Regions:
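Catalytic domains that recognize anionic headgroups
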Residues: 1-468
Length: 468
């Protein structure tokens, strides 16, 4: 093998495995056909922070305190003003491991949870916080308004809540509920516009520009580990329906087929756009020589639900729409694909990607595999919701606002720990005593509608033992 192989990971945030069956994504489908395609990899967590932390450290989500704690009621988890440190400074990450063997490590992230300030970039020599720069560029006015709260920290947020609560005591219950919903809808509309609901691009162009800048100015032609996060597939979407997850999850709005289909169509539009941006990034890396001797990995951190099991989006129970993600590995020599055309449909633990990349970088293997296919059991862990930032306000309002009460209850009910355990085609949903466990035969029941645990008790006991 000619020197150390470059390793490039393009992580397509929020892309579920089944999206690979859609039309209009020629680049992704061609790469899957010509490389090694793991059609049903299993995300270790149900939202960005736990999945990335697990992937970077080769640990299960529940073994990482910074991402498995209860975030319900923690204002610092708000995506617009994240102040959490998800990893402690002593963690050994895949980036730090590769740095020690001579790799130049670079993170380009368009995700607010994956930045230089959250410690998920631990070990990377170069970090480009694309999300921050992209959102300030598009939303200078909003950034200035939010800076008052950001700089004031939690005390500023609590003062704002307290002032709001005192004002609401003067209103009759009916008027308070109307006012809460009116303000919530206006806030959601504002955030939706700020996040680029009507734009297909949510920062992919800026991420690719940052990649070009890095390769032109800092690329040292030594072995490279480049990790990019694209967030185009994340809500909010170009769709003419309400986008507030918790209005649907609480039953205030009906998540009917029309709404679910409109949101899903917007989701697929973004993925089709992202397909073109992936092509652009690959062309950039070919021109710079990064793909002269490299493995390109394309995957996701979690999927997205659109009405299945009456759920919307992610950071929820690890049903298939959330837990299953695509994983594609393609080897390049002299800028051209070494066609392998291998497909693997069994469950693959995404946190084991850490070891597989390490094997690849150290020369122990020449293709991505490592521990990926060898696991008897694979798990995906939901340790609670990520949207807990408004718990204080909801708790204050719920005695006098029926809508706030319903949203609070919906968040509370989904803030329970659930672990999915895979063994071949069988999947166990373990609820830790909150309710009866469920087991599904995914070969015959891919929609997870028929609980077969009562006729598979012996296997269920073995699988439940894997849910720590």
């Amino acid at each position: 093998m000619q020197g150390k192989r470059n390793v490039v990971v393009l992580l397509l945030d929020t892309v579920r495995a089944s999206a690979m069956r859609e039309s209009g994504i020629p680049v992704l489908r061609s790469l899957a056909k010509r490389g090694t395609y793991y059609s049903a990899a299993v995300a270790p967590g149900t939202w960005t922070a736990p999945s990335h932390a697990s992937l970077f450290t080769n640990k299960r989500v529940t073994e990482i305190p910074g991402v498995s704690k209860d975030f319900f009621g923690r204002e610092e988890i708000d995506p617009w003003m994240v102040k959490n440190r998800f990893l402690n400074g002593g963690e050994t990450t895949i980036a730090s491991r590769l740095s020690r063997i001579g790799y130049q490590t670079t993170l380009l992230s368009n995700n607010p949870f994956l930045t230089s300030t959250t410690n998920l970039g631990l070990g990377f020599e170069n970090i480009y916080d694309v999300w921050k720069e992209s959102n300030i560029k598009y939303n200078k006015g909003l950034a200035e308004k939010l800076s008052v709260i950001i700089n004031g920290g939690q005390s500023a947020r609590h003062k704002m809540y307290l002032a709001s609560y005192v004002c609401t005591r003067l209103l009759p219950k009916g008027a308070l509920d109307w006012l809460y919903m009116e303000l919530r809808n206006r806030l959601n509309e504002g955030v939706s516009k700020a996040e680029g609901r009507n734009r297909l691009d949510k920062g992919a162009s800026d991420a690719n520009a940052a990649l070009r800048k890095y390769l032109e100015q800092r690329y040292n032609y030594g072995p490279q580990f480049i990790f990019m996060n694209y967030i185009e597939a994340h809500e909010n979407y170009p769709a003419r329906v309400a986008q507030d997850k918790w209005l649907y999850m609480s039953g205030i709005l009906d998540l009917d087929e029309r709404a679910a289909r409109a949101l899903y169509n917007g989701y697929i539009k973004r993925i089709r756009y992202l397909d073109r941006k992936i092509s652009e990034a690959i062309t950039t890396m070919k021109k710079s020589g990064v793909l002269d001797n490299a493995t390109l990995i394309i995957t996701s951190d979690h999927g997205q639900m659109f009405g299945e099991h009456h759920m919307l989006y992610h950071s929820l129970q690890p049903y298939e729409g959330i837990a299953r993600v695509p994983l594609i590995a393609v080897n390049y020599t002299n800028g051209k694909i070494d066609s392998e055309s291998e497909r693997f449909d069994g469950p693959v633990p995404m946190n084991k990607l850490h070891g597989a990349i390490s094997d690849l970088a150290s020369g122990r293997t020449e293709a991505l595999d490592g521990q990926l296919k060898g696991a008897r059991y694979t798990v995906s862990e939901h340790t609670g919701i990520s949207e807990g930032w408004d718990e204080t306000l909801l708790r204050m309002l719920k005695p006098r606002s029926k809508s706030a009460a319903r949203i609070y209850e919906a968040k509370h009910m989904n803030n329970k720990r659930v672990t999915a355990v895979y063994c071949g085609n069988m999947k166990l949903m373990h609820y830790f005593g909150e309710r009866k466990d469920s087991m599904y035969d995914l070969d015959n029941d891919p929609e997870e509608e028929h609980n077969v645990i009562d006729v598979n008790r012996a296997l269920a006991i073995k699988m439940a033992a894997q849910a720590k």
